[in-house]
Structure formats: C-alpha cells, structure tokens
Design a protein with these regions (language model features):
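Extended polysaccharide-engagement surfaces of secreted carbohydrate-active enzymes
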Residues: 3-341
Length: 341
C-alpha cells in the first residue's frame, strides 16, 4: 500500500482530489501509526515491518522534519533510533498482491511499483461524494499506475490531469456528469458498478495476471440507470506482470455508436516544468503537438486535444523527470498512435 513513503493513489478513493491531502501526506500518517504500533508487534511482525518502515523513512527525506507537533516528539525519537539501528537492514521485498474485494492488484519491485485499479459488478468505477472527485469517472477503468523516482501522482496531479485520458484506460470520452445536488447542496453522482463479473486475477509467487471485462452498461439503482454512459461499449483487458516487463492486452473492444471514438490511453505522465523530457519513437525524436487546456475545458470538450499521428510504431520511450523513464513495445507491425504534450 506504500511506495517510498507515499500511499498508493488507487487506494485513496475520492481523497485523491484533495490538494492538501496528497499521497505523501497520507503515507506519513501511515508511517507515524506504524512507529506507534511497533511495541505491540511480536518478533515475526517486527522482522517484517522494521525493514520496510526503515526504507520508507529513508526514502521520504522530509518525514522527520514533518514531525513538528508535541505528540510527534516520541515518534521522531523512535524513527531516528530505527534509522541508526545497524541491525535492521532497510528493505521492501518484491511482491505480487491481489485485492479481490476491491478489484486492485499491486506488483512491487525494488525500483518500481505497478498497480491496476478495476471495477466490476461488485466495485464502483470511482468514488464521487460531497462535490469531491467530480471528474474521476474512469479512475477504476483499468487505470495503470507506475510508481518510480518521478513521484508522478504528487503536486496536484489529479486536479490537472485529463480525466478522459488516464493511463491504461479504454473509454468513450464523454461527460458522464454528477447529477443534481442533493439536500446537502453537493453533487453525489457519477459513480456506478458495471454488469461484469469477469474481473480479477491470479498469481504464482511474485508474478501474476489480471483481467477485466468492461462495458458501458451499468447497474441500475431503484429501477433507474445510475448514469447515461456508452451502452454499446464493451471489451476485455488483461495485464501480465513479470520482473521488468508488463504486458497489456486488449481484445474485443467495440462500440457501435462511433460519434465519439473509443480511446485506449497508453500513458499520461506529468513532465518536467519545461517539458524537456525526451520522447522517442522507433529511435527518433519527433515533433509533437503541444495542447493547453484546464480540466473544465477538457470536460466540456471545448478544446482540440488531438495528437500528432504516427504510423508503423514498433517502440517508444519517454524520459522520466528523475528516473530513466519507461519504454513501450508494440508487437503488431501496423500500430498507429497519437501523441500530444
């Protein structure tokens, strides 16, 4: 649930939209609680928790400085003692973990963490409540997360990202809406369960596969549709997770109503402030369209967000902000993609 001291965003529900409650903030709260609970752990529990806790504290350089309140004095002292304890080796082990009761999968390695958030007949597409996370309609639509040295999801990522183009998702980019405000004065709508049960996965040791059937048909509430989306959209997505490779597959993706085309989003990453990240396609650095729009303009579809079209794409690579970046391989010879900044 934590990577380098940050709580995973796929586990945060609607709180991802709170700019003052980032994954770093929640991660620090979790670390503080972990320090408090150390005395209640048995020997086996301490052997498991101490190495991970030590690495989280080492990776979050601002954790100790954030402990400023009177009630944090003891926590800070214990954290310092843990850092100086040479008998504890900082280590977060590789793991492949399925969470079937919330349709999540986490694939953790030393230098990265990959996660997928899905939805089904059991789990909703997102959490929208009390006017929070109003545009989070596709956050569980097979969204893929890559955590590495770039800290992608901090610094108000969720309130600035294109809500129709979240990494790994296959969607019809339409404004689903949030319904009318209730007696509280806040909107509560836009989240729903699908009618699909083929959602889940399995694993062998530290490797695994997951799959998700999806469609625009949603479950009804009190006999009425929860939301008007794209009833003709359907398909299946699968993810095969190995050591350094993640294989992402899509099959049977169709939508009879093509007024607004279906989009599959390969990646959507936050760049450096100057946008200087190198992007390569088949070994060349092409010119790519620069698009500017705020989230409200994106939701209204009032701005042209089409990208530069590339054909016969075999591979691509995007340089990271701090990391070496991520490579993408396309096995089919006729692959065509669109790219914009």
């Amino acid at each position: 649930a934590i990577y380098k001291g940050c709580m995973l965003d796929c586990l945060k529900g609607r709180s991802v939209s709170r700019p003052t409650w980032s994954n770093r903030d929640i991660g620090r709260e979790a670390m503080k609680i972990s320090v408090r609970l150390l005395d209640f752990l048995g020997e086996n529990g301490r052997k498991t928790v101490l190495p991970m806790l030590k690495e989280w504290i080492e990776e979050d350089k601002g954790f100790l400085d954030s402990l400023k309140n009177v009630e944090d004095i003891d926590i800070k002292d214990r954290a310092k003692k843990l850092l100086s304890d040479t008998s504890v080796r900082s280590e977060v082990p590789s793991v492949h973990k399925l969470y079937p009761l919330m349709d999540r999968v986490i694939h953790r390695r030393k230098k990265y963490l990959f996660a997928v958030s899905m939805y089904s007949e059991r789990i909703q597409n997102t959490e929208i409540m009390n006017h929070e996370n109003r545009f989070g309609w596709h956050q569980n639509n097979g969204m893929t997360y890559i955590y590495d040295a770039d800290n992608q999801y901090t610094e108000n990522y969720w309130n600035t990202v294109n809500p129709f183009r979240l990494s790994g998702t296959t969607v019809v980019p339409v404004n689903i809406g949030n319904g009318k405000p209730d007696s509280s004065g806040y909107v509560q709508g836009g989240d729903f369960c699908s009618k699909e049960s083929w959602v889940g996965g399995t694993g062998i040791e530290n490797f695994g596969i997951s799959g998700m059937a999806f469609s625009g048909k949603v479950q009804t509430v009190s006999g009425d549709p929860a939301v008007s989306y794209a009833p003709d959209l359907k398909g299946k997505k699968s993810w095969f997770m190995f050591e350094k490779e993640i294989v992402c597959l899509g099959a049977g993706i169709t939508n009879k109503n093509m007024e607004i085309p279906v989009e599959t989003i390969i990646e959507n990453k936050k760049l450096r402030k100057d946008g200087s990240n190198q992007f390569l396609i088949n070994g060349e650095s092409p010119d790519v369209l620069l698009r500017k729009a705020d989230v409200k303009e994106l939701v209204k579809r009032s701005k042209d967000m089409s990208g530069t079209r590339f054909e016969q794409v075999h591979w691509a690579h995007l340089e990271g902000n701090r990391s070496v970046g991520t490579g993408y391989y396309f096995p089919e010879e006729n692959t065509e993609i669109q790219v914009c900044r």
